[in-house]
Amino acid sequence: MKIAHINNTSGIASIIAKEQKKQGHEVDIFVFNKIIHSQFGGNMINYKSPFARWNLFKKIKEYEVWHYHYPYGSLKRSLEKRNKDKVYLKHYHGGDLRGKYDNDFCLVSTPDLLKYSPNGKWLPTPIDIGEMKGEIFSSPERNETIQEDRCHLRIAHYPYYENFPSTDYYSKTLLTLAHEKKCEIVEILRLPHIQALKAVNSCDIVIGKILPDVGWFGKFELEGMALGKPVIAYVSDELYKVYKPPIYRTTKESFKKDLENLLEDISERQRLGKEGSGYIRNFHSVESVTKIVQESYNLLHTMN
Protein backbone atom coordinates (compact mmCIF):
# COMPACT_ATOMS: atom_id res chain seq x y z
CA MET A 1 0.00 0.00 0.00
CA LYS A 2 1.01 3.61 -0.47
CA ILE A 3 0.49 5.32 2.88
CA ALA A 4 0.66 9.00 3.86
CA HIS A 5 0.99 9.81 7.55
CA ILE A 6 -0.25 13.36 8.02
CA ASN A 7 1.27 14.88 11.18
CA ASN A 8 3.66 13.08 13.49
CA THR A 9 2.42 13.58 17.04
CA SER A 10 5.14 12.50 19.52
CA GLY A 11 6.93 10.71 16.68
CA ILE A 12 4.28 7.97 16.64
CA ALA A 13 3.90 8.13 12.86
CA SER A 14 7.66 7.62 12.49
CA ILE A 15 7.58 4.44 14.57
CA ILE A 16 4.60 3.00 12.68
CA ALA A 17 6.01 4.00 9.30
CA LYS A 18 9.34 2.30 10.01
CA GLU A 19 7.56 -1.01 10.62
CA GLN A 20 5.24 -0.51 7.64
CA LYS A 21 8.25 -0.04 5.36
CA LYS A 22 9.70 -3.31 6.67
CA GLN A 23 6.47 -4.95 5.55
CA GLY A 24 6.89 -3.62 2.02
CA HIS A 25 4.60 -0.59 2.08
CA GLU A 26 5.56 2.74 0.54
CA VAL A 27 5.23 5.29 3.33
CA ASP A 28 5.80 9.04 3.72
CA ILE A 29 5.23 11.40 6.62
CA PHE A 30 4.14 15.03 6.27
CA VAL A 31 4.67 17.38 9.21
CA PHE A 32 3.81 21.01 9.85
CA ASN A 33 5.72 21.82 13.05
CA LYS A 34 9.43 22.67 13.05
CA ILE A 35 10.03 21.19 16.50
CA ILE A 36 8.38 17.89 15.57
CA HIS A 37 10.35 17.89 12.33
CA SER A 38 13.67 18.42 14.14
CA GLN A 39 12.90 15.68 16.66
CA PHE A 40 11.35 13.00 14.48
CA GLY A 41 11.82 13.97 10.83
CA GLY A 42 9.34 13.76 7.97
CA ASN A 43 8.57 16.03 5.03
CA MET A 44 8.23 19.57 6.40
CA ILE A 45 5.28 21.54 5.00
CA ASN A 46 4.82 25.27 5.56
CA TYR A 47 1.05 25.12 5.85
CA LYS A 48 0.80 28.92 5.96
CA SER A 49 2.02 29.07 2.37
CA PRO A 50 -0.80 28.77 -0.22
CA PHE A 51 1.61 27.18 -2.68
CA ALA A 52 2.82 24.63 -0.09
CA ARG A 53 -0.80 23.74 0.72
CA TRP A 54 -1.64 23.32 -2.96
CA ASN A 55 1.43 21.14 -3.44
CA LEU A 56 0.55 19.01 -0.39
CA PHE A 57 -2.98 18.29 -1.57
CA LYS A 58 -1.67 17.49 -5.04
CA LYS A 59 0.99 15.16 -3.63
CA ILE A 60 -1.21 13.16 -1.28
CA LYS A 61 -3.60 12.27 -4.10
CA GLU A 62 -1.00 9.62 -4.98
CA TYR A 63 -1.57 7.73 -1.70
CA GLU A 64 -4.22 5.09 -1.03
CA VAL A 65 -4.19 5.67 2.72
CA TRP A 66 -4.38 8.96 4.57
CA HIS A 67 -3.48 8.23 8.18
CA TYR A 68 -4.23 11.55 9.83
CA HIS A 69 -2.74 12.15 13.27
CA TYR A 70 -4.32 14.85 15.46
CA PRO A 71 -7.26 15.69 13.15
CA TYR A 72 -8.06 19.33 13.77
CA GLY A 73 -8.95 22.68 12.25
CA SER A 74 -8.68 23.82 8.66
CA LEU A 75 -6.43 20.95 7.59
CA LYS A 76 -9.06 18.46 8.76
CA ARG A 77 -11.77 20.28 6.83
CA SER A 78 -9.62 20.46 3.70
CA LEU A 79 -8.74 16.77 3.80
CA GLU A 80 -12.35 15.73 4.30
CA LYS A 81 -13.34 17.63 1.17
CA ARG A 82 -10.80 15.61 -0.80
CA ASN A 83 -10.84 12.13 0.77
CA LYS A 84 -13.19 10.41 -1.68
CA ASP A 85 -11.98 6.87 -2.51
CA LYS A 86 -9.24 7.13 0.10
CA VAL A 87 -8.73 5.05 3.21
CA TYR A 88 -9.06 8.01 5.58
CA LEU A 89 -8.11 7.07 9.14
CA LYS A 90 -8.45 9.65 11.89
CA HIS A 91 -6.01 9.00 14.73
CA TYR A 92 -6.79 11.16 17.75
CA HIS A 93 -4.14 11.99 20.33
CA GLY A 94 -5.82 14.12 23.01
CA GLY A 95 -7.02 17.69 22.75
CA ASP A 96 -8.13 17.09 19.17
CA LEU A 97 -10.99 14.94 20.51
CA ARG A 98 -11.25 15.39 24.27
CA GLY A 99 -14.49 17.18 25.09
CA LYS A 100 -15.74 16.74 21.52
CA TYR A 101 -17.43 13.82 19.74
CA ASP A 102 -16.76 11.64 16.69
CA ASN A 103 -19.13 8.84 15.71
CA ASP A 104 -16.90 7.54 12.89
CA PHE A 105 -14.53 4.63 13.22
CA CYS A 106 -11.22 6.09 14.37
CA LEU A 107 -8.17 5.33 16.49
CA VAL A 108 -7.43 6.96 19.84
CA SER A 109 -4.04 7.03 21.53
CA THR A 110 -5.31 6.88 25.13
CA PRO A 111 -8.29 4.90 26.45
CA ASP A 112 -9.93 7.90 28.12
CA LEU A 113 -10.75 9.16 24.61
CA LEU A 114 -13.07 6.23 23.94
CA LYS A 115 -15.86 8.05 25.78
CA TYR A 116 -15.80 10.65 22.97
CA SER A 117 -15.64 8.08 20.15
CA PRO A 118 -18.23 5.31 20.63
CA ASN A 119 -17.05 3.55 17.45
CA GLY A 120 -13.37 4.20 18.08
CA LYS A 121 -10.59 1.77 18.93
CA TRP A 122 -7.73 2.30 21.36
CA LEU A 123 -4.37 1.98 19.63
CA PRO A 124 -1.64 1.63 22.28
CA THR A 125 1.22 4.01 21.60
CA PRO A 126 3.98 2.03 19.86
CA ILE A 127 7.38 1.93 21.53
CA ASP A 128 10.48 1.04 19.53
CA ILE A 129 11.88 -1.52 21.97
CA GLY A 130 14.65 -2.51 19.56
CA GLU A 131 15.99 1.04 19.53
CA MET A 132 16.13 1.07 23.31
CA LYS A 133 18.08 -2.16 23.44
CA GLY A 134 20.96 -0.52 21.61
CA GLU A 135 24.25 -0.02 23.34
CA ILE A 136 23.69 3.66 24.06
CA PHE A 137 20.62 2.79 26.14
CA SER A 138 22.28 0.10 28.25
CA SER A 139 21.78 0.56 31.98
CA PRO A 140 24.35 2.83 33.64
CA GLU A 141 27.00 1.11 35.72
CA ARG A 142 25.25 1.84 38.99
CA ASN A 143 24.03 -0.71 41.49
CA GLU A 144 21.02 0.68 43.26
CA THR A 145 21.02 -2.08 45.87
CA ILE A 146 24.15 -0.66 47.51
CA GLN A 147 22.91 2.92 47.60
CA GLU A 148 22.09 3.89 51.15
CA ASP A 149 21.59 7.62 50.61
CA ARG A 150 18.54 8.69 48.63
CA CYS A 151 20.33 11.81 47.40
CA HIS A 152 21.98 9.57 44.79
CA LEU A 153 18.63 8.83 43.18
CA ARG A 154 17.95 10.73 39.98
CA ILE A 155 14.41 11.61 38.97
CA ALA A 156 13.44 12.25 35.34
CA HIS A 157 10.82 14.96 34.98
CA TYR A 158 9.24 16.42 31.86
CA PRO A 159 7.76 19.83 32.78
CA TYR A 160 5.00 19.66 30.18
CA TYR A 161 3.01 22.26 32.12
CA GLU A 162 5.51 25.05 31.37
CA ASN A 163 2.86 27.14 29.62
CA PHE A 164 0.05 26.02 31.95
CA PRO A 165 1.23 26.89 35.49
CA SER A 166 -2.15 26.02 37.00
CA THR A 167 -1.37 22.35 36.28
CA ASP A 168 2.03 22.44 37.98
CA TYR A 169 1.50 19.97 40.81
CA TYR A 170 5.21 19.13 40.97
CA SER A 171 7.66 22.02 41.33
CA LYS A 172 7.17 22.80 45.00
CA THR A 173 7.62 19.15 45.98
CA LEU A 174 10.60 18.61 43.69
CA LEU A 175 12.38 21.75 44.86
CA THR A 176 11.82 20.75 48.47
CA LEU A 177 13.13 17.21 48.02
CA ALA A 178 16.13 18.41 46.02
CA HIS A 179 16.92 21.04 48.67
CA GLU A 180 16.74 18.31 51.31
CA LYS A 181 19.20 16.31 49.15
CA LYS A 182 16.78 13.41 48.92
CA CYS A 183 17.10 13.24 45.14
CA GLU A 184 18.43 14.95 42.03
CA ILE A 185 15.95 16.30 39.48
CA VAL A 186 16.75 15.83 35.79
CA GLU A 187 14.50 17.93 33.55
CA ILE A 188 13.76 16.35 30.18
CA LEU A 189 12.96 19.36 28.03
CA ARG A 190 13.92 20.61 24.56
CA LEU A 191 16.25 17.70 23.90
CA PRO A 192 16.54 15.69 20.69
CA HIS A 193 14.65 12.44 21.15
CA ILE A 194 17.74 10.23 21.44
CA GLN A 195 19.32 12.53 24.04
CA ALA A 196 16.06 12.60 25.99
CA LEU A 197 16.01 8.79 26.09
CA LYS A 198 19.62 8.73 27.27
CA ALA A 199 18.80 11.20 30.03
CA VAL A 200 15.82 9.12 31.17
CA ASN A 201 17.98 6.01 31.11
CA SER A 202 20.43 7.67 33.52
CA CYS A 203 17.66 8.13 36.09
CA ASP A 204 16.12 5.89 38.72
CA ILE A 205 12.51 7.13 38.72
CA VAL A 206 10.31 8.75 36.07
CA ILE A 207 7.71 11.28 37.14
CA GLY A 208 4.75 11.08 34.83
CA LYS A 209 1.75 13.29 34.34
CA ILE A 210 -0.87 14.13 36.92
CA LEU A 211 -3.91 14.94 34.79
CA PRO A 212 -7.10 14.51 36.84
CA ASP A 213 -9.30 15.37 33.86
CA VAL A 214 -7.63 12.71 31.72
CA GLY A 215 -6.66 9.90 34.06
CA TRP A 216 -3.98 8.37 31.84
CA PHE A 217 -0.41 8.92 30.68
CA GLY A 218 1.55 9.25 27.45
CA LYS A 219 4.62 8.31 25.48
CA PHE A 220 7.12 9.79 27.94
CA GLU A 221 5.92 7.47 30.69
CA LEU A 222 5.81 4.48 28.33
CA GLU A 223 9.40 5.06 27.25
CA GLY A 224 10.44 5.19 30.89
CA MET A 225 8.73 1.85 31.48
CA ALA A 226 10.41 0.38 28.40
CA LEU A 227 13.75 1.39 29.88
CA GLY A 228 12.90 -0.47 33.08
CA LYS A 229 12.24 2.63 35.18
CA PRO A 230 9.52 2.85 37.82
CA VAL A 231 6.97 5.48 36.82
CA ILE A 232 4.80 7.52 39.18
CA ALA A 233 1.73 9.12 37.60
CA TYR A 234 -2.01 9.64 37.95
CA VAL A 235 -4.30 6.91 36.62
CA SER A 236 -8.01 7.21 37.32
CA ASP A 237 -9.78 4.46 39.26
CA GLU A 238 -12.06 3.82 36.27
CA LEU A 239 -9.21 3.22 33.82
CA TYR A 240 -7.01 1.38 36.31
CA LYS A 241 -9.73 -1.20 36.96
CA VAL A 242 -9.89 -2.02 33.26
CA TYR A 243 -6.24 -1.82 32.16
CA LYS A 244 -4.13 -2.13 35.36
CA PRO A 245 -0.90 -0.54 34.07
CA PRO A 246 2.14 -1.08 36.35
CA ILE A 247 2.26 2.54 37.49
CA TYR A 248 2.92 3.84 41.00
CA ARG A 249 -0.34 5.74 41.27
CA THR A 250 -0.51 9.19 42.78
CA THR A 251 -2.75 12.27 42.90
CA LYS A 252 -2.04 15.99 43.04
CA GLU A 253 -2.91 15.92 46.74
CA SER A 254 -0.71 12.95 47.67
CA PHE A 255 2.19 13.47 45.26
CA LYS A 256 4.82 14.51 47.84
CA LYS A 257 4.07 11.64 50.19
CA ASP A 258 3.86 9.10 47.36
CA LEU A 259 7.14 10.20 45.81
CA GLU A 260 8.91 10.05 49.17
CA ASN A 261 7.55 6.55 49.71
CA LEU A 262 8.79 5.46 46.29
CA LEU A 263 12.21 6.96 46.94
CA GLU A 264 12.46 4.88 50.10
CA ASP A 265 11.17 1.60 48.69
CA ILE A 266 13.86 -0.14 46.64
CA SER A 267 11.88 -3.36 46.21
CA GLU A 268 8.85 -1.49 44.86
CA ARG A 269 11.02 0.38 42.39
CA GLN A 270 12.55 -2.87 41.20
CA ARG A 271 9.12 -4.52 40.88
CA LEU A 272 7.68 -1.64 38.87
CA GLY A 273 10.74 -1.50 36.62
CA LYS A 274 10.48 -5.20 35.81
CA GLU A 275 6.71 -5.22 35.32
CA GLY A 276 6.81 -2.01 33.30
CA SER A 277 9.21 -3.35 30.70
CA GLY A 278 7.10 -6.51 30.39
CA TYR A 279 3.95 -4.42 29.98
CA ILE A 280 5.53 -2.54 27.08
CA ARG A 281 6.60 -5.76 25.36
CA ASN A 282 3.12 -7.25 25.73
CA PHE A 283 0.94 -4.28 24.78
CA HIS A 284 3.03 -1.59 23.06
CA SER A 285 5.37 -3.42 20.70
CA VAL A 286 5.69 -1.93 17.24
CA GLU A 287 4.65 -5.22 15.65
CA SER A 288 1.40 -5.60 17.60
CA VAL A 289 0.44 -1.94 17.16
CA THR A 290 1.15 -1.96 13.42
CA LYS A 291 -1.03 -5.05 13.06
CA ILE A 292 -3.96 -3.13 14.58
CA VAL A 293 -3.26 -0.23 12.22
CA GLN A 294 -3.36 -2.51 9.18
CA GLU A 295 -6.60 -4.09 10.38
CA SER A 296 -8.04 -0.58 10.67
CA TYR A 297 -7.01 0.27 7.11
CA ASN A 298 -8.62 -2.94 5.88
CA LEU A 299 -11.84 -2.20 7.75
CA LEU A 300 -12.08 1.31 6.31
CA HIS A 301 -11.33 -0.03 2.84
CA THR A 302 -14.35 -2.35 3.06
CA MET A 303 -16.50 0.59 4.19
CA ASN A 304 -15.62 2.73 1.13
List where the protein language model places each region:
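Conserved catalytic-core segment of nucleotide-activated headgroup transferases in glycan assembly
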Residues: 128-196
